[in-house]
């Protein structure tokens, strides 16, 4: 029932004219609504299945996330489901918007990483596999009745995408700016501990250096901790 309410057949986007309502504004709002629903329901192929997966996962784990970002390889916006165990925040965190370090653990095949390296988004480094077992994923596999196969060419590398605040001298021109850490996204290959990329995570014309938010938090029930 939740899926039908959140994603109706004509799309989830609704628009509202704020302020004086005119015919031109209403027509513009309708165009925005139609375009956004077209993007979500037709172009972004992962949107509906990932949202369905999130709704199924939410009561099992109590917490789940959506990650909305621009994919350099696909050259379009992407909205993906992120499991609670794959998004790590400091112990004291109460809300994502106030958290200064968010780590997204991403599983990527070698080919996916090569694509990003070829596109110039990742550095060309030697990747290294890890021997660590994912106990949480193993438990999910047990519930689903599936098991791991030999790694072979299907090995998934652990990529750590960290949304952090840093003081990088080479990226600051004003001496006063060095006193304040500003938002960056640092991506690391967990196996080799080498940096794949560092990108700023704020708009160039923003004097406040406000972080661009990538994640949306869904809680099944409120709780005492961050994850509900």
Regions found by a protein language model. Give the residues of each.
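Extended alpha-helical, oligomerization-prone segments that build pores/tubes and scaffolds
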Residues: 1-228
